[in-house]
Amino acid sequence: MTNVTGTERVKRGMAEMQKGGVIMDVINAEQAKIAEEAGAVAVMALERVPADIRAAGGVSRMADPTIVEEVMGAVSIPVMAKCRIGHLVEARVLESLGVDYIDESEVLTPADEVYHLNKRDYTVPFVCGCRDIGEAARRIAEGASMLRTKGEPGTGNIVEAVRHMRQVNAEIRQVASLREDELMTYAKNTGAPYEVLLEIKRLGRLPVVNFAAGGVATPADAALMMQLGADGVFVGSGIFKSENPERFARAIVEATTHYEDYELIASLSKGLGNAMKGIEISTLLPEQRMQERGW
């Protein structure tokens, strides 16, 4: 790695390069190739997609490095991998493998209930989830180079991702309308670092990209999130838990790109087969709600 690799500017720039694209969860080289051929801008290598993690229960950890290396060897697009919240060693292991991004993810069982990782200590860029501007600003202050809505992973239900995207964007507008001398009180009330809020106010947006994630299951879901202001889309279980993964993958990529072309989205949605089985959020017990992990 060069001396400039790992700087905030470089890491944020790497994340910007994925803007407008779809990032797909994969569990092996075959799925990674399907994702790449469908037009994914990156893949997330893991042992089980969120729907299977949810169904299995128990403790979910970093993927076997063999799987990560297998995926890295199969595709030319960037490869991401997940570590547990606060797990210093899992993050270092993934960095040593040469992954392009690390997702400090609430999909896995948190390793630390007090501290997230100091992502500025790593040369590899990090992705983190958020539900509101407080969470977004705290992750940015820790060094996250890309954000995503938490949604409710593995449910095939878009409602929580919609809620989180609308919440963050509404709060960005609120911050932009505040006087600078009002920001400190807002920072206190939201737990958002003042310096990050100041940057958001001056830019009128988050200083890093914010993708949609957690519940995207159809081309229409992807287009909806783009219309709500997402910079791109993560699809976890929605591709390979569908009836026809290859067709769903291509359709979601196309819908993400052409999210205001309703005739095209209608065409893409015809004859796709069944989407992944969905879960109503109200049926989840509090301990089953992955979005509650992290702080």
Swiss-Prot record:
- Electron transport among the record's keywords? no
Task: List the GO biological process terms.
Answer: amino acid metabolic process; pyridoxal phosphate biosynthetic process; pyridoxine biosynthetic process
Subunit comment for this entry?
In the presence of PdxT, forms a dodecamer of heterodimers.
Classification via NCBIfam families: PRK04180.1, pyridoxal 5'-phosphate synthase lyase subunit PdxS
Chain sites annotated for binding D-glyceraldehyde 3-phosphate: R166
In short, the EC number is 4.3.3.6
Name this protein carries in UniProt: Pyridoxal 5'-phosphate synthase subunit PdxS
Q: Which residues bind D-ribose 5-phosphate?
A: D25, G154, G215, G236, S237
Please give the InterPro entries that the UniProt record associates with this protein: Aldolase_TIM (IPR013785), PdxS/SNZ (IPR001852), PdxS/SNZ_N (IPR033755), RibuloseP-bd_barrel (IPR011060)
Leader peptide range in chain numbering:
none
Which species is the source of this protein? Answer: Bacillus cereus (strain G9842)
Q: Name one GO molecular function term.
A: pyridoxal 5'-phosphate synthase (glutamine hydrolysing) activity
